[in-house]
A protein has these predicted regions:
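A beta-strand edge to alpha-helix "cap/lid" segment located at domain peripheries
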Residues: 34-36, 47-110
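Short, well-ordered alpha-helical segments enriched in acidic and aromatic residues
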Residues: 17-34
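Short, conserved clusters of charged catalytic residues that mark active-site
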Residues: 6-7, 57
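Basic/polar N-terminal segments that are highly enriched at the extreme N-terminus
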Residues: 1-3, 109-110
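Residue-level signal for short amphipathic helical patches enriched in basic/charged
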Residues: 14, 18, 93
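PAS/Per-ARNT-Sim sensory domains
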Residues: 42-43
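Amphipathic alpha-helical repeat scaffolds
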Residues: 9-13
């Protein structure tokens, strides 16, 4: 398994655990985050908008982890309370740093 795949898995675990130090260490300075409600957040915007959801004990079950060039494509199922949802995200790397995350929302898993 590649180092980028391992970093990606650890990135999601760090988010679930609320480990901001790991996240800070692995984001590029010019990091951007985009999702349908939050297109093109910068690093500070990511922490302002997304970090309040970290450390809530949610778990990610990966159904797809594919490395292609500088990208890792991730599909996961995650629980939030009683609901389980499925999303796909594309993480773009610059070396071992995550430079960009693009989120594509999925659906609830029944």
């Amino acid at each position: 398994m590649s180092n980028r795949i391992e970093i990606t898995k650890d990135f999601y675990k760090a988010f679930a655990d609320g480990n901001r130090d790991f996240i800070e260490e692995h984001l590029a300075e010019d990091f951007t985050f985009s999702s349908p409600p939050d297109p093109h957040l910068d690093r500070a915007g990511y922490f302002r908008r997304c970090w309040p959801g970290a450390g809530k004990g949610g778990q990610f079950e990966f159904t797809r982890l594919i490395e292609s060039g500088d990208e890792v494509i991730v599909t996961y199922e995650a629980q939030q309370g009683e609901n389980t949802g499925r999303n796909t995200e594309i993480l773009t790397f610059d070396g071992d740093k995550i430079r960009k995350v693009e989120v594509y929302f999925g659906w609830n898993v029944i």
